[in-house]
């Protein structure tokens, strides 16, 4: 059995906001309320999008008519999964139960091994064998 770090992405709709910072705060707060305290092992952050012109990354927040669409990233570690695909299904199931009606997309799955020394982990990409 292997251990995996799974990163999922979701689009979060926030109404009645004027600034990107407000939208980010509300989106993270709402997602956190749905996840906690049961799923305190899930990390929530704002995703990034690359500018199509210059390639510079910026926060995934888009506002129109005081309504924002915020790209959120959810990260969790899945232990003792049979494969990367199995870890994806576990993460989507665990997080998806709390975030009903919010579609989740897998961004990245990385295998890691528990180290014998405390706090250290060795990471291996999904594509490495």
UniProtKB/Swiss-Prot annotation:
Coiled coil: none annotated. It holds the Pfam family DUF555. Belongs to the UPF0212 family. This is UPF0212 protein Mbar_A2902. It comes from Methanosarcina barkeri (strain Fusaro / DSM 804). The lineage of its organism: Archaea, Methanobacteriati, Methanobacteriota, Stenosarchaea group, Methanomicrobia.
């Amino acid at each position: 059995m292997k251990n995996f770090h799974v990163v999922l992405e979701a689009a979060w709709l926030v109404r009645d906001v004027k600034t990107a910072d407000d939208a980010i705060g509300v989106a993270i707060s709402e997602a956190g309320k749905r996840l906690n305290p049961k799923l305190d092992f899930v990390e929530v952050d704002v995703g990034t999008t690359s500018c199509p012109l210059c390639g510079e990354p910026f926060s995934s927040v888009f506002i129109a008519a005081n309504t924002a669409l915020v790209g959120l990233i959810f990260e969790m570690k899945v232990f003792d999964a049979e494969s990367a695909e199995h870890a994806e299904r576990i993460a989507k199931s665990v997080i998806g139960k709390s975030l009903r009606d919010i579609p989740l997309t897998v961004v990245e799955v990385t295998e890691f091994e528990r180290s014998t020394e405390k706090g250290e982990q060795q990471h291996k990409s999904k594509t490495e064998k």
